[in-house]
Amino acid sequence: MSIAVALVPSLLFGALSLLLGAFPTDIRRQNTAVMVGAGAVSLGCAAMLGSPWSLSATVWGVACGLMWTGGQVFVLWAFRAWGVSRTMPLTTALQLLLNATLGVSLFGEWRAPGALILGVVALALIMLGAAACSWQERTGPGPTPAQRRDGLLATVASAVLYGSYPSLLRAVEVPPAHAVGPMGLGLLAGAGLCALILPRRAPLRGPRIVPAALAGGLWAVGNALMLRSTAAVGVASGFTLSQLGFVLATLGGLTILGEERTGRERTVVAAGVAAAVVGLVLMGLATSMDTGVSPSQ
């Protein structure tokens, strides 16, 4: 059951990417609306969970909310530079590498005999699948070299900011459920910063603000489930399973958003998706092997 819960965020995160890609609008308006939706729903999730707000949880939760705000700004920049189907696989792979490394090295995950080897193989397959999904032929349709450079830089920045907060909360010993509400406050503060700092090319209120706010709400629900799942199955496994939404985002980017790919690129993407699914199965096995082994602190 814990594995099934850990998979739900991947569907929500994948749908979020497609929603933002399908309804683009002014970058300041879109970012602000996403943060407002995410912040408001996070506060609602916190009320439903009924978790206490300690001083430590509030401080670190707000910090994590601001980190996610920065990651979202960069990922939307990357979407516009080189598309959803290239951004999501790469940012996913980098986040997986970061969190799995921290989960194993700092928190002693995958300690059961054979679990570490199986987990590493699973991660390698998922990362290989992500790389395959973002691969582009030199002569094929797609972004210019300048757009690829901007997209790569923005994607790397988003991965660092997105991928750090689950392990940060565990490192400072803040229960994940306790951080959901404070993260909502950080996201609302991030909305204010987006409104103040990002270029003012259009008014905040305008077309397609509702889909952006809805996307933020989807993320907040997925985030609450992800943070709870990391407590049940560990950071390395919980975060990894939640990030498999890149499969949905990649396929949706090609079919729903109509992002251009050559026939060879589509074949490589299909192979990448297959590799990621195999990695998912192995990740579930590694997690089940690790059950009952207490991680070191």
Feature locations, PLM:
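Polytopic alpha-helical membrane proteins, predominantly small-molecule transporters/carriers
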Residues: 1-297
